[in-house]
Amino acid sequence: MGKDLTKQLDHVYERYLNGDVTRRDFLKYLGVAGAAAGLVGGPFGLLSRPAWAAKSIRFDGWGGSVSEAFREHAFKPFTDATGIKVIDGEFGDMDTYLTRVKASFPPGGEFNLAHLSGVFDYARYVGLGFSVVLDESKISNLKNVMRAMMEPYKAITKGTLSAVPYDFGQTGIGYNTKYISKEKAKKLGASLLWAKELDGKLGSWGDWRTNIWYAALHTGQHPNKIKDMDAVWNALREQREMVKKYWGSGAELMSLLANEEIYATVAWSGRVATLQAQGHPIGFLAPYNCYSWQECIFVLKGTDLDVAHKLLDFMLAPACAIAVAEGQGYPPSLDPTKVPIPESVKKLPAFDPTGKLEGYLFADPVYWNGHQLEWAEKWDRIKAGG
């Protein structure tokens, strides 16, 4: 009977992850099975007895609709299946969270999983000694994740992972289709942000990295291998005279575009998705080698890996990953050639139906971090009109 029940549990669990069984029916089945014989064996058996005894695991994220989706589609089913509570924390920004991690004792000890901002933070946490080596064989849903999203992490940790890629986006170009045609935007590419006819109607983010990236594209250079920095600085000085506003937040970006104070700007794909959903005539252009980024679920040193593997598997389940994508406006890390993706996600800016992310360029953290002090300081002077 025990073996039969285990097989049934495994089968129902697999169907739930594939989206064939509703969350309600899955939880109902867990309750019946748990009352009959307890949850043991199969994927549930991946959790050792000490792990089952662990009463909780902590997850820190961005809050809001993203955390709500995690709670409904991952944390609640996980707790019902294992008895382990997920402590759901929130943070406002990456630097503040890292300070808290450093201040914990032992460093990182009270923190387990975190929804980090991709490759830069991944490299930073690895460099500080907070990384682990995940056993990929214990995260079955990892097989559905785009390889193109895993490779930047594995390049940092020599072929291993201390995190799983979770979602991605692009800092492309948002433009008002009432004044700029799709054909013109596509023809000009990154150089749209230097179009003379848009003088006084251009915007940009105040971030040094984004502006240098687009100046590199405008001058025909690879952003991770810039050869002529003088050309980049000259392009930014030229653009500075045409920029009406350097925005500092997503809300300000949306306001400038929605109120037609500017007609074109570098823009976060998720914010453009929100503007489009609100009915504003805003297009999104992702030029080749568009500044692309991703977010990951990072596992910190000292975390019970048996528990972490199982929780990550729940979070990568299509039902959960897609719900989070719909909540935050950024596509999931799931490979569309392996997992059915609903239209609500397919229409998001930055979505790639091929799963290959060709033309999506991720910043080389070693290269950019190595130039940060010099380039950020010079950019600040140019932005100020110097």
Language-model segments: residues:
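N-terminal secretory signal peptides
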Residues: 1-25
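A ligand-binding cleft/hinge motif common to bilobed small-molecule-binding domains
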Residues: 121-124, 258, 264-281
